[in-house]
A protein has these predicted regions:
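Extended, well-folded interaction surfaces typified by the phenylalanyl-tRNA synthetase beta subunit core
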Residues: 1-20, 150, 203
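Predominant activation on well-ordered alpha-helical scaffold segments within soluble catalytic domains
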Residues: 2-10, 26, 58, 62
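A carboxyl-terminal module marker
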Residues: 22, 32-44, 50-204
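Short beta-strand micro-motifs enriched in acidic
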Residues: 28-30
Length: 204
């Protein structure tokens, strides 16, 4: 399904569409030992152009999963998928189950499709998301106090994953945290070599 999405992106790009947000729902075919095939459904997402980067694309996936009321979502860096940029790719988990992968398509792969701009795609198991979706929302009264938003930046070793930092923040908040979202990773002047500054937005 990734190949199909890249072909769609390439077609839009060749038509001089400067930006696009795309999706496709389809089946993939996995051979079985009995000679037949499993045909799970997958949701493919694709985007390129102004306003699209790793963090905004990740935010879109988080919004989708939140609207489906899928709980216990986490992201882990993925470095062994040759289709994606090794530093901008992550696996998506929910409840310990792998839902899929997303990230920036490797520039060499994008070039093979005639696209010379950054492409972001996601491959998510539609069947798994359907099974894990939440039930009908339960009414909750409006909170007595408005939500509080705070931004924090954490300086850490480059080997520390964003997922590990998010988990530490959630544990430290002890149930007070409603949302946590990554919005920047900085390396450069002011930050020691081998370190990075990771910025999060918190809603309490």
């Amino acid at each position: 399904i990734l190949t199909s999405m890249l072909e769609i992106v390439a077609r839009n790009y060749s038509y001089r569409n400067k930006a696009a947000r795309l999706y496709e729902l389809g089946k993939i075919y996995l051979p079985r030992e009995d000679g037949l095939a499993d045909e799970p459904k997958y949701l493919s997402l694709g985007a390129y152009g102004d306003g699209v980067d790793f963090f905004s694309f990740k935010g879109g996936i988080e919004t989708l999963l939140r609207e489906l009321r899928i709980a216990d979502v986490r992201f882990e860096a993925c470095t062994d998928n040759d289709s994606y940029h090794p530093g901008r790719c992550a696996n998506v988990y929910a409840g310990g189950k792998l839902l899929g992968v997303f990230g920036q398509i490797h520039p060499l792969v994008a070039a093979n499709y005639g696209v010379d701009t950054e492409i972001y795609t996601a491959e998510l198991s539609f069947d798994a998301m359907y099974e894990m979706r939440g039930g009908i929302p339960v009414y909750q009264p409006l909170p007595k106090f408005p939500a509080v938003t705070r931004d924090i930046a954490v300086v850490c070793d480059e080997t520390v994953t964003v997922g590990a930092l998010e988990e530490s923040i959630r544990r430290g908040a002890k149930g007070l945290l409603k949302e946590v979202s990554l919005f920047d990773i900085y390396r450069g002047p002011g930050v020691a070599p081998g370190k990075m500054s990771v910025a999060f937005s918190l809603v309490l």
